[in-house]
């Protein structure tokens, strides 16, 4: 009867735990290493899931339309959004960054209202205002002065914006397509972007060195699950 509510609670708990583990891993092996390693883990785990459910490791039945929008969603959400988010973990910590990320539904609804002609009820608008007020109260003091580094806060909001836009792009491309296959396509494009970035910055030696830190690799592996 309460399957939806229970599922939402489990997702929230998993999201919080993964943020804590990713913060720990980022402080040990760097945010770039964490990003690419956890995307590889996610790609493999989803591939195994597809192998069990659809007898194929990688989705080959997506249309060009779906590839375009899901790929773009992966670039914006899983590359740019997570690039900012994981960097913010190292500056303001995962707890504050996760709090900022709670604004993703608000940003998504607002963008949908302005650009996709989606309708927001009075109840939804009140919920948005309450959510934003809660975030401001949590990160500001009594004089409304921000208590956390501005750079970290901006990076966290950049991550939230990337996630929100990524969700909208994903919604446009997914239609009635299999969600697991769609997620793997998004991850593939995000992974490709990180590979290009790490290659351009010549950071592969640092990624290779990250595997020597067992504690860091353990943390990013647990967070990926």
Q: Predicted segments — roles?
A:
Residues 10, 37-38, 100-103, 122-126, ...:
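Hydrophobic core positions of alpha-helical segments in small-molecule transporters
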Residues 16, 20, 47, 75-79, ...:
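Hydrophobic/small/kink-forming positions within alpha-helical transmembrane segments
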Residues 1-13, 19-33, 37-69, 82-92, ...:
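Membrane-interface interhelical linkers
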Residues 40-45, 100-114, 129, 188-193:
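Alpha-helical transmembrane segments of compact multi-pass small-molecule transporters, enriched
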Residues 46, 111-116, 122-141:
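Hydrophobic transmembrane alpha-helices of multi-pass small-molecule transport proteins
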Residues 30-31, 93-94, 120, 178-179:
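A helix-boundary/kink motif common to multi-pass secondary transporters
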Residues 1-4, 54-65, 111-124, 172-179:
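Helix-coil boundary and interhelical linker segments in multi-pass alpha-helical membrane proteins
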Residues 25, 34, 38, 88, ...:
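Hydrophobic/aromatic residues within transmembrane alpha-helices
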